[in-house]
Each structure stands twice: as C-alpha cells, then as structure tokens.
C-alpha cells in the first residue's frame, strides 16, 4: 500500500534527460501552481506556465513519462521514502488524524481497493524496493493509461502538434485491467467510538455509493453541497444557527 503516492514523489527528482530537480526549470520561467497529488483513483501532475514556456513543460512531462527509470537511484528512493513517512507521521498526529484509517477499514472490506489509505502503511513503505519502482513505472506510466490536458492560450491544432512532438515516441504500455471493487454493503449498521486528545467531539456518518464514472456521483456531490457544503446550507442552518448544538457542519461526496 502507498506505492502510488511514493512514486509520485519520485517523479519530481529528475528524469534521464532532465536530471535536476523537476521544479527548478519551471521556477526559472515563471511557472506557478506546479505540484502533484495522489488519491483513491488517480495520480495527477499539473503546472501553470507562460505560453512561451509550453514546450519546456511538455518536454519535462514527456521525459518523466517516457524516460524516468535511468534517473531513479536507491538513494533517491530512500530519501523520498523518508519524506513520505514524515508526511504520514505529521498527518497521523494531527487532530482526528487517524479517522480515515478507521473509515476505510470499516466501510470497505478487505481486498477492496479503498480498504487502505493512499499514503500506505509504514511496513509497506519500508519494504518498497527498486524492483517495485521499475515494475510500477512499466505497468502504470504508459500513455495509454494517462490523460493529458492543455487548457488556456492554445488552439487544438497547435496542441496536437506540440503533444505529438514531445510524446509521440513514447511506446504504449501494457493493457491495465480495470479494478472495480463494487459498492460494498454492510451486513448491519456499524458504529465505532474513537478516542483522541482533543477537547471536542465529532460525529461522522458515512455511506457508500457509486464511483466517479457512474451517474450518481454528480448528484451526490450536489446533494452534499446543499446539505452541508456552505455556511448557508441546510444542516448549518438547522444545527449551528437554529438549535445551536454544533459549532460546524460539513458534508461531502468523495
């Protein structure tokens, strides 16, 4: 567990034809908002660059998609392993930092892809090897498993020409089977009380529903906004303002 996120970190440590830190050349041309994130269904990488720096951004992205492994070393893996483990410790030590472990482990059965957190366990992070790095890159980072988005000061014809120039020689990766754990149903209502060293109490109620590619996803996100996504939402009005039994309410669909 946690390898997709660990690999995300390795993607910023240089590639075969751009071996330096990934961020440095972007900073030099005035790029902003450059980062990457990993969540349950995807890893994404993004940056906002001046129009004149588009070729640089496409070169950097294509080089780490097609030519990363020659720049990855055991030292880099060990370094980023430590960074991720510190990130995990910081998150775990935050107020309610262990909540999502309980949610995922109890709401989704063992074997379901959402049963574990994206940051992973310390044991799995410790065991990640260079062989794991090579296999993950080869299996998952082909162009047939990626979506490339260019938005802003560019037309379709220019976008296709630039993308073909920089990405056209990257070979297709292996076919990746779709992982579908289905929507689990608990055999009975489940309640759990967790203690934390915080002078407040939180109540969470969770339900499972279909994924992002299913029609109900947008409906659920909209419903969550109506219920608790805004300061004027229905649960805020009822529980915070009218009955004054809560200091805050939120609702969201993941």
Over which residues does each language-model region extend?
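Non-catalytic, conformational "gating/processing" segments within enzyme and secreted inhibitor domains
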Residues: 74, 81, 130-166, 203
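Non-catalytic beta-strand/loop surface segments
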Residues: 17-53, 90-145, 169-214, 225-254
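Short amphipathic alpha-helices in soluble, non-transmembrane regions
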Residues: 59-64, 161-167
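M16/insulysin-pitrilysin zinc metalloprotease superfamily fold
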Residues: 13-16, 48-79, 229-231, 253-254
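Active-site SXXK
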Residues: 2-15
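Bacterial peptidoglycan biogenesis and beta-lactam-recognition machinery
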Residues: 15-17, 66-68, 156-157, 167-173
């Amino acid at each position: 567990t946690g390898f997709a996120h660990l690999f995300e970190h390795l993607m910023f440590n240089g590639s075969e034809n751009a071996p330096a830190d990934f961020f440095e050349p972007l900073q030099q041309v005035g790029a902003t908002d450059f980062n990457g994130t990993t969540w349950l269904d995807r890893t994404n990488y993004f940056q906002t660059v001046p129009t004149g720096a588009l070729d640089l951004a496409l070169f950097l992205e294509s080089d780490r998609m097609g030519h990363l492994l020659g720049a990855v070393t055991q030292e880099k893996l060990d370094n980023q392993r430590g960074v991720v483990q510190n990130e995990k410790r910081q998150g775990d030590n935050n107020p309610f930092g262990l909540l999502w472990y309980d949610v995922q482990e109890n709401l989704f059965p063992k074997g379901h892809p959402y049963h574990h957190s994206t940051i992973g366990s310390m044991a799995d992070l410790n065991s990640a090897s260079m062989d794991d790095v090579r296999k993950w890159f080869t299996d998952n980072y082909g162009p047939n498993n990626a979506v490339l988005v260019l938005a802003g000061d560019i037309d379709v014809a220019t976008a296709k020409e630039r993308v073909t120039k920089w990405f056209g020689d990257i070979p297709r990766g292996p076919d990746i089977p779709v992982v579908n754990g289905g929507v689990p149903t608990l055999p009975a209502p489940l309640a759990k009380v967790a203690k934390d060293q915080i002078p407040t109490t939180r109540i969470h109620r969770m339900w499972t529903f279909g994924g992002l590619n299913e029609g109900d996803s947008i409906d659920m996100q909209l419903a969550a906004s109506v219920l608790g996504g805004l300061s004027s939402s229905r649960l805020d009005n009822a529980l915070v303002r009218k009955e004054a039994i809560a200091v805050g309410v939120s609702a969201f669909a993941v």
